[in-house]
């Protein structure tokens, strides 16, 4: 089992809304702002509510998302393309966004509902993240919890930590991939990639 997935399953993660409010007030003071001024006085509450949503994946379980199957026997590729994703870079706590393409060869006992793939992307995107790990976690979860015989995941994202600060290259997109099981076969992988790239 993926070490990070395992640690998430074993830990009971909770969300401390008041702690987030206090941290935001301290942050505003630390950058030289007045958290009591008009325009900022409700900002700690707003950010605390937003963070509950942005980091909801910390309280979610991929096993729960992938537990149900439909009784359909197929050994062909199932691919859902262009799943929108929004996440937060764990290095700068700035957003990155883009799309995920998720394909799998189902387990013998059936296929998943297509929405399950989008929900799985959400579980891992809604937490402090790096794109490389996000891509791998989605692939590993499909093998671990859905019994997929083959998996391919490709993500394409723009990182605001690279667009609005630092090198400031707003047109740059990062592409990462993870391939597992039967989709490591060069011919099968090539077929999957041609479907992903076909716009």
UniProtKB/Swiss-Prot annotation:
GO terms for biological process: one-carbon metabolic process; tetrahydrobiopterin biosynthetic process; tetrahydrofolate biosynthetic process. It catalyses: GTP + H2O = 7,8-dihydroneopterin 3'-triphosphate + formate + H(+). GO terms for cellular component: cytoplasm. It comes from the Bacteria. InterPro entries: GTP-CH-I_C/QueF, GTP-CH-I_N, GTP_CycHdrlase_I, GTP_CycHdrlase_I_CS, GTP_CycHdrlase_I_dom. Pathway: Cofactor biosynthesis; 7,8-dihydroneopterin triphosphate biosynthesis; 7,8-dihydroneopterin triphosphate from GTP: step 1/1. Pfam families: GTP_cyclohydroI (PF01227). Belongs to the GTP cyclohydrolase I family. Homomer. This is GTP cyclohydrolase 1. It comes from Bifidobacterium longum (strain DJO10A). The gene is folE.
């Amino acid at each position: 089992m993926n070490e990070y997935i395992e640690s998430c399953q074993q830990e009971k993660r909770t969300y401390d809304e008041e702690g987030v409010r206090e941290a935001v007030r301290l942050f505003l003071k630390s950058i030289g702002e007045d958290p009591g001024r008009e325009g900022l006085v409700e900002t700690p509450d707003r950010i605390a509510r937003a963070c509950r949503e942005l980091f909801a994946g910390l309280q979610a379980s991929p096993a729960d998302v992938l537990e149900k199957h439909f009784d359909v026997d197929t050994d062909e590729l199932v691919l859902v393309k262009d799943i929108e994703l929004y996440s937060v870079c764990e290095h700068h706590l700035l957003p990155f966004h883009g799309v995920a393409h998720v394909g799998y060869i189902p387990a013998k006992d059936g296929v998943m509902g297509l929405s399950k793939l989008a929900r799985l992307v959400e579980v891992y995107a809604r937490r402090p993240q790096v794109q490389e790990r996000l891509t791998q976690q989605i692939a590993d979860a499909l093998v671990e919890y859905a019994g997929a015989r083959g998996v391919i995941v490709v993500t394409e994202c723009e990182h605001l930590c690279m667009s609005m600060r630092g090198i400031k290259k707003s047109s740059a997109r990062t592409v990462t991939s993870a391939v597992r099981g039967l989709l490591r076969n060069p011919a099968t992988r090539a077929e999957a990639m041609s479907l992903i790239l076909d716009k």
